[in-house]
Amino acid sequence: MATSPWPLAPPTVLGYFAALVAEDEGFALLEAAICVAQDDHPELDVQAVLAEIDGLAAKLKARLPADASALRRLQSLNHYFFVELGFAGNVNNYYDRGNSYLHQVLATRRGIPITLALLYCELASQLGLTARGVSFPGHFLIKLRLPQGEVVIDPFNGRSLSREELDERLGPYRARQGLAGDFEVPLGLFLQAAPARDVLARLLFNLKEIAHTAEDWPRLLAVQQRLVLLLPQDAEQLRDRGLTWAELGRPAEAADDLSAYLLSRPDAADAPALRERLAELQRGGAPRPL
């Protein structure tokens, strides 16, 4: 479990997140994912949540002999996580943002695939299993490597998925992307382990979509602040944050972000409309929808 990097005054919520994701590789994914909830729950003790997860892993680890095979550890983990602890997908309220907050998933035992996968992979890691998240189109999955071969699990319901089932799930995506027929992309390319930054981005994109759909501009801005820090090379995050600043009546901040986007993407398809919006903001005119 990571210890706090802040020996003196505590950081701001956003500063804490920025420090966690500053490293190019190997940042503390679980800790960063937990602290996302501090936008709604600023008093959340991230270290206490990490300790709770460690406690769950320790209980299962104590039941297993030191020489337990990888297959036995996997079977024990699946029963413990999905049956005994009762973790499952939140089928009744899938789009509740609480499903993206790991401390709430721990409390309710309900979540979405990506948060369930984060918890499962952490427990697997503490059992000595190699488990990674997979950004499968439309549904986050878990991939484990065993001496007997590779296992793919749907964290929403705990089912192991066969190659045929995975191919079937890919069918609609391949059709939409024009990847069927002679140009079909091998299944294995869709089952590559997702880097930590991509996993965290996918979690934040879920929250971004929820807030945008609800036109909840303050919450949307909070998520976008994190995305700009997490994906500093992605100019579209600046553009989107700029538009949210405009919705919140903050023209100076909106103009800064839109200017930065247009500087990096002068030939983007939306550049002409955004230049008009930027001119309005700089004149002090009322913002209008694009």
Predicted region positions:
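A structural boundary/capping signal
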Residues: M1-L290
